[in-house]
Amino acid sequence: GLLQTIKEKLKELATGLVIGVQS
């Protein structure tokens, strides 16, 4: 559903931020 898609996108953004901070 739409909510699941939003959750996945938020997780992708969070992961990207974490990787960006670490590097």
Curated annotation (Swiss-Prot):
One of the record's GO cellular component terms: extracellular region
Protein's cellular compartments: Secreted
Keyword annotations from UniProtKB, A to Z: Amphibian defense peptide, Secreted
Superkingdom of the source species: Eukaryota
Tissue and organ distribution: Expressed by the skin dorsal glands.
One example of a Gene Ontology biological process annotation: defense response
Family the UniProt entry places it in: Belongs to the frog skin active peptide (FSAP) family. Aurein subfamily.
Function per UniProt: Has no antimicrobial or anticancer activity.
Protein name (database record): Aurein-4.4
Organism encoding this protein: Ranoidea raniformis (Southern bell frog)
